[in-house]
From Swiss-Prot:
TM ranges: none
Sequence similarity: Belongs to the AdoMet synthase 2 family.
Taxonomic lineage: Archaea, Methanobacteriati, Thermoplasmatota, Thermoplasmata, Thermoplasmatales
Keyword match Transport: no
Name of encoding gene: mat
Function according to Swiss-Prot or TrEMBL: Catalyzes the formation of S-adenosylmethionine from methionine and ATP.
Keyword Transferase listed: yes
Residues that bind ATP: 136-141
Catalyzed reactions per annotation: L-methionine + ATP + H2O = S-adenosyl-L-methionine + phosphate + diphosphate
Keywords: ATP-binding, Magnesium, Nucleotide-binding, One-carbon metabolism, Transferase
Pathway annotation: Amino-acid biosynthesis; S-adenosyl-L-methionine biosynthesis; S-adenosyl-L-methionine from L-methionine: step 1/1
Protein name listed in UniProt: S-adenosylmethionine synthase
GO molecular function, one term: methionine adenosyltransferase activity
Length: 400
C-alpha cells in the first residue's frame, strides 16, 4: 500500500521564539475535565465488557457527558453540599447482541462512580453527585460501518499534533500535575479543581493559577491567605525548574482582602462543580493535555469516542505521537513539527486521505536528508495504528 504522505518544509518562526505565547491547562477536577474523565472511563468499561463477552469491542461513543453544577455552602472549618451535581451520561452504545441484552446502564453508571471515587477523595459520590445514564443504541448505519475486521474510519475528520512542547507549555502542564500530585501530601487543602494559564511575553512567563481550596482544612481567612502565599512560593519553586526565564506567579486573583473584607476561593469538595460550575466533554484540554491557541488544534473531543475506528480519537493521538517521534529520531535539526491526518468515512484507518507533515528546521539545515526518514516513520506509525486500541482500553493513553 502506498499511503498519501506529504512532508514539506515550513518557513516561519517557531512558537517558542515568538514574542507572545499563551497556554492553558484545566486540571483533573475542572468540570470540563471531569466530563472528559468520566466519558473515557465509561468507554473503557464498555470496551472491556464487550471484549470479555463477545471477543471484540462493539460500537459505542460515550463522548456526550454533561456536568451540571450543584449548590454548596462552604465555610472555614467545613461547609455543606446543599444540592448534588447532576451528571448526564449520553451517547450511543451496542445494547443488544443477538438475544443478549447488554447491562449498559449498570456498566456506565458504575464506571462513572468508580472514576469519581478513585480521583476525588473529598467528594461523597453517594451524596454529592447524581448520575443519570441516557445512553442509547447506535444508528444502524454506524453499527454496520463499525466492523473491527474492516477497521474503516467512521467519520470524515482530522487529527492534529505538534512537537516539541515549548518551555511555557511544559511549565503549564507540569504545574497542574504538581498541584494535583506531589503537592497534595504537603498541602491537602489544595483541591482538585485547578486551572493554570501561562502567558509568555518575550523572556517573562506569567503563571495564573486558580486553585479551589478545601474548607475543612482551613480555620479562618488569615490562614487561607497564609496558605495562598505559601502556595505561590511552591509553584514558583517548581516552575523555575523548567526555564531560565523570569517567572511570575499569581494565585486566585479574584480573592478580596481589603477594608476588613476577606473573600477566598473556598469549596467543600475541592471542586467548583459543587457550586454551579458546569462542564462538557471536549471543552477543555486537547489530547496532549493543553489548550494552545498559538498552535494548530483540532476541536474534536477525543474522550469517550470508540478506540477502534473513531478517527477523532485515533488521529489526534497518533498525530502527536508521530510529531514527538520525528523530533526524537531526527535530532537537533528539527525546531518544530506539525502533523495533520485527514480521514474519509469508510476508508481504512491506516490509509488516511492525507497525512501532512510540516517541519520547521533549525538554521540552514539540508532538509532533504530528513524527508525520506520522516515519510518512512509516518508510514510505519500508520501501519500500526490499531496498536493504540488496547492502550486506550487499558488507560495507558491520556486524552485530556
Amino acid at each position: 500500500m502506498e499511503r498519501n504522505i506529504s512532508v514539506e518544509e515550513l518557513h516561519q518562526i517557531p512558537t517558542p521564539k515568538k514574542e507572545v505565547e499563551i497556554v492553558e491547562r484545566k486540571g483533573i477536577g475542572h468540570p470540563d475535565s471531569v466530563a472528559d474523565g468520566i466519558a473515557e472511563a465509561v468507554s473503557r468499561s464498555l470496551s472491556k465488557y464487550y471484549i470479555e463477552h463477545y471477543g471484540r469491542i462493539l460500537h459505542h461513543n460515550t463522548d456526550q457527558v454533561e456536568v451540571v453544577g450543584g449548590q454548596s455552602a462552604p465555610k472555614y472549618g467545613g461547609g455543606l453540599v446543599l444540592e448534588p451535581t447532576y451528571i448526564l451520561l449520553s451517547g450511543r452504545a451496542t445494547t443488544k447482541v443477538g438475544n443478549d441484552r447488554v447491562p449498559f446502564k449498570s456498566i456506565t453508571i458504575k464506571a462513572a462512580r468508580d472514576y469519581l471515587r478513585e480521583h476525588f477523595r473529598h467528594l461523597d459520590v453517594d451524596a454529592d453527585v447524581m448520575i443519570d445514564s441516557r445512553i442509547g443504541q447506535g444508528s444502524v448505519d454506524l453499527v454496520e460501518v463499525y466492523d473491527t475486521k474492516k477497521l474503516e474510519a467512521n467519520d470524515t475528520s482530522f487529527g492534529v499534533g505538534f512537537a516539541p512542547l515549548s518551555e511555557t507549555e511544559t511549565m503549564v502542564l507540569n504545574t497542574e500535575k504538581y498541584l494535583n500530585g506531589e503537592l497534595k501530601k504537603k498541602m491537602p487543602m489544595v483541591g482538585y479543581d485547578i486551572k493554570v494559564m501561562g502567558f509568555r511575553q518575550k523572556d517573562t512567563i506569567n503563571l495564573t493559577v486558580a486553585a479551589a481550596m478545601v474548607d475543612k482544612y482551613i480555620h479562618d481567612a488569615d490562614e487561607y491567605f497564609n496558605i495562598k502565599d505559601e502556595l505561590k512560593q511552591l509553584v514558583l519553586d517548581n516552575a523555575v525548574e523548567y526555564t531560565d526565564k523570569e517567572v511570575k506567579v499569581y494565585i486566585n486573583t479574584a480573592d478580596i482582602k481589603e477594608d476588613g473584607k476577606a473573600v477566598g476561593y473556598l469549596t467543600v469538595t475541592g471542586m467548583s462543580m459543587e457550586n454551579g460550575d458546569d462542564g462538557s466533554v471536549g471543552r477543555g484540554n486537547r489530547v496532549n493535555g493543553l489548550i494552545t491557541p498559538y498552535r494548530a488544534m483540532s476541536m474534536e473531543a477525543a474522550a469517550g469516542k470508540n478506540p477502534v475506528t473513531h478517527v477523532g480519537k485515533l488521529y489526534n493521538v497518533l498525530s502527536n505521537k508521530i510529531a514527538n517521534d520525528i523530533v526524537k529520531e531526527e535530532g537537533n535539526d528539527i525546531a518544530e513539527v506539525l502533523v495533520r491526518i485527514v480521514s474519509q468515512i469508510g476508508r481504512p484507518i491506516d490509509d488516511p486521505h492525507v497525512a501532512s507533515v510540516q517541519v520547521i528546521y533549525e538554521g540552514n539545515v539540508d532538509h532533504s536528508k530528513h524527508k525520506n526518514n520522516i515519510r518512512n516513520l509516518v508510514d510505519d506509525r500508520l501501519a500500526h495504528i490499531s496498536d493504540l486500541t488496547m492502550e486506550f482500553v487499558e488507560g495507558k493513553i491520556p486524552v485530556f
